[in-house]
Amino acid sequence: MQLFHLCLIIFCSCPTVQASKLCLGWLWGMDIDPYKEFGASVELLSFLPSDFFPSVRDLLDTASALYRDALESPEHCTPNHTALRQAILCWGELMTLASWVGNNLEDPAARDLVVNYVNTNMGLKIRQLLWFHISCLTFGRDTVLEYLVSFGVWIRTPPAYRPPNAPILSTLPETTVVRQRGRAPRRRTPSPRRRRSQSPRRRRSQSPASQC
């Protein structure tokens, strides 16, 4: 397995220092968090279950459809664009390496181990990275961070004391902000009905004819 990581470092031609540090962190267990500079953390992302993240193919299609021009531009756009470029390049190199290893390994069991490791471990890391940066570009970084906190609070709350449905990122500002939960709309108390005057009615003066 260490040989596999070493091959990853050699073949992962990431263009920036941050991506290179990410690869080195996987090899030597360095405490490098790729989300730290964006206000998040690996631990915060870990609250989301693995099946929450779309497939790499779907995420790449989304990135291409929404941000292809910015990703291919030679100019610097945002740190999220840069990190997204790095993740896409690393995944491409990783697939090239996995194909090379698969084609050159004669042992089917060893080949399956490599493929499963890439898809299960490395694939999940890439899916998390792609989802995070695409979401930051789509919804805004503050909204994504607030969503991660809201989901973390929701998932750690016992089922009996939390809403049945998890927060949804696209509707976060309207419905899933933690501080807005539990507030019922204030009803206007009806004003008391105006009581009638208790003063006795004035008697109508009787005509002399009625007194006869």
Swiss-Prot record:
GO terms for cellular component: extracellular region; host cell; host cell cytoplasm; host cell nucleus; T=4 icosahedral viral capsid. Pfam families: Hep_core_N, Hepatitis_core. Residues 165-212 are annotated as: Disordered. Residues 184-206 are annotated as: 3 X 8 AA repeats of S-P-R-R-R-R-S-Q. It is found in: Secreted; Host nucleus. SUPFAM superfamilies: Hepatitis B viral capsid (hbcag). GO terms for molecular function: DNA binding; RNA binding; structural molecule activity. Keywords: Disulfide bond, Host nucleus, Host-virus interaction, Repeat, Secreted, Signal, Viral immunoevasion. Phosphorylated. Sequence repeats lie at residues 184-190, 191-198, 199-206. May regulate immune response to the intracellular capsid in acting as a T-cell tolerogen, by having an immunoregulatory effect which prevents destruction of infected cells by cytotoxic T-cells. This immune regulation may predispose to chronicity during perinatal infections and prevent severe liver injury during adult infections. This is External core antigen. It comes from Hepatitis B virus genotype H subtype adw4 (isolate Nicaragua/2928Nic/1997). The lineage of its organism: Viruses, Riboviria, Pararnavirae, Artverviricota, Revtraviricetes.
